Design a protein with these regions (language model features):
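Small-residue (G/A/S/T)-rich helix-start motifs and N-terminal tracts that mark the onset
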Residues: 1-120
Length: 120
């Protein structure tokens, strides 16, 4: 019953559509201790119906997340220290990426770099 109600609320997908047609989500997430949070957030965006999901993690974690969820595009962000993003460089890269929605935070370590990226 709930599944039928949910399906009725969702718009019909254009059969001629492509990944870009169904929305682009940018997820900025993850740290050494919380790689799973980044992966689960990206997978949730895919499962929710997003057409194109880019998962941005600290550069040293990019090889760890690449290919774990095949539907995700993974991208490494510049780091200030191991596993912590360099705020100015990361914010500049994030600003260049196309997105209809932005999710920032799951699994990011609290710190100056994280706070600065969120503020920018």
């Amino acid at each position: 019953m709930l599944a039928l109600l949910a399906a009725a609320l969702l718009p019909e997908r254009d059969p001629r559509g492509h990944k870009g047609t169904f929305g682009r989500v940018l997820v900025v997430a993850g740290s050494l201790d919380y790689v799973g949070a980044a992966l689960m957030s990206g997978a949730a965006a895919v499962r929710a119906g997003s057409g194109l999901v880019t998962l941005c993690v600290p550069a040293s974690l990019q090889p760890v997340v690449a290919g774990r969820v095949p539907e995700l595009i993974s991208r490494g962000l510049p780091e200030e220290t191991a596993y912590e993003i360099d705020a100015p460089a990361a914010a500049a890269e994030i600003a260049e990426l196309p997105a209809d929605a932005l999710l920032v935070g799951p699994g990011l370590r609290p710190g100056r770099g994280t706070t600065a990226v969120v503020q920018k």
